[in-house]
UniProtKB/Swiss-Prot annotation:
Expressed by the venom duct. This is Conotoxin pr6a. Keywords: Disulfide bond, Knottin, Neurotoxin, Secreted, Toxin. Disulfide bonds join 2-20, 9-24, 19-28. The keyword Cytoplasm does not apply. Intraperitoneal injection into fish (1 nmol) provokes hyperactivity and erratic swimming in various directions after 14 minutes. It comes from the Eukaryota. Signal peptide: none annotated. It is found in: Secreted. One of its GO terms (cellular component) is extracellular region. Transmembrane segments: none annotated. The presence of a 'disulfide through disulfide knot' structurally defines this protein as a knottin. The cysteine framework is VI/VII (C-C-CC-C-C).
Length: 29
């Protein structure tokens, strides 16, 4: 499942990028 960064991680400076599965969580932490 792919979610926009702002959906999964809150509004970050990369919010216009997409991240899939746990990758976004790893980037955000």
């Amino acid at each position: 499942t792919c979610l926009a960064r702002d959906e999964l991680c809150g509004a970050s400076f990369l919010s216009n990028f997409l991240c899939c599965d746990g990758l976004c969580l790893l980037i955000c932490v």
